[in-house]
């Protein structure tokens, strides 16, 4: 059985294509069931995020299974395959294992180290488990991917530094002001960057949030979302003294805060330090504000330097993550390869059990006066003999499977014992393999 991956991501497809191929979580049951109804696709999981759509599946026919999944994606979203195929990638066997381990560990993300992708894969797996489209192999595979991601996150510093301008602003504020607990933040503007900054500041312990925006209703909505207070834009300078941290991101064509404005506010605050972050382009705050006593001004360029330095650190840590992924690939691939011998082991045990049962019944028929206790002892003895005889060939077959050398042994056993094997795995034996 082989693991295959078919998908597209921010690296191969523009957003216009990704949004057309996305799956809605509210409507995921039908495509999951359609996926595993494809010829020779026995298990399937669909991962759909803003940056990637990927299908993880198991098949005996790598080329055929891959082609059928590509056709499934095109047909389901009503896109001509010849238009879609240029954006698709596919992996199988060890390359598929490596890819999913890297994706789960956020080594393949647009922002290396971001934590969202692991949760998104867990959610996708949850749907597959709920609708029973994942089985022994993908269950084991994805749980392994989750543990690999955990190793990467705990054994490296891949997620320890800010790589967004909004989070860099919080990191910088912490360095200047120390503990942010009890600090009040004022946002000038109500766009996406201000929203991200609000999340990060409040998560870092900031006490209060003030929002000043030219369109009061929009500022009011943002303030309400985070339990803050909206300030009419024309009252900005009357309320500025309440803020310890001011982040400005408007679309104004000129500066809106001059040194004289801040000088008056600082005096009113009795020269208690104020931290200004100007991430607007063109700038919102006159750079001469930085010359004032107790006023600290940083621009988007200052933050970008932090982001770039932290990104370089993350990339360095990512190389450690890649080493962890490579270590884990070998272990999982050994387990997957060992499943190739499962049908032969199942058939061999069944043949021995058939013979044991037949011979035991013949023996018991000849001993009419045998007590129930004696019959039980004979049952245990014959079962023990059978298990001891099968122990070595079973162990050899498992080791051969882990080394990718199953054919020689399985073919010999099938011929020697006239075994009829099927592709359906024995549940108990697979459980035994999983526990190893």
UniProtKB/Swiss-Prot annotation:
Entry annotation: catalytic residues: 50
Coiled-coil blocks: none
GO molecular function list: glutamyl-tRNA reductase activity; NADP binding
Keywords attached to this entry: NADP, Oxidoreductase, Porphyrin biosynthesis
Enzyme class (EC, first level): oxidoreductase
CDD domains with a match to the protein in the record: NAD_bind_Glutamyl_tRNA_reduct
Site (Important for activity): 99
E.C. numbers: 1.2.1.70
A Gene Ontology biological process term: protoporphyrinogen IX biosynthetic process from glutamate
Reactions that this protein is recorded to catalyse: (S)-4-amino-5-oxopentanoate + tRNA(Glu) + NADP(+) = L-glutamyl-tRNA(Glu) + NADPH + H(+)
Record: residues binding substrate: 49-52, 109, 114-116, 120
Subunit structure: Homodimer.
Function field: Catalyzes the NADPH-dependent reduction of glutamyl-tRNA(Glu) to glutamate 1-semialdehyde (GSA).
Alphabetical list of PANTHER family matching this protein: GLUTAMYL-TRNA REDUCTASE
Name of this chain's protein: Glutamyl-tRNA reductase
Protein species of origin: Pelobacter propionicus (strain DSM 2379 / NBRC 103807 / OttBd1)
Gene: hemA
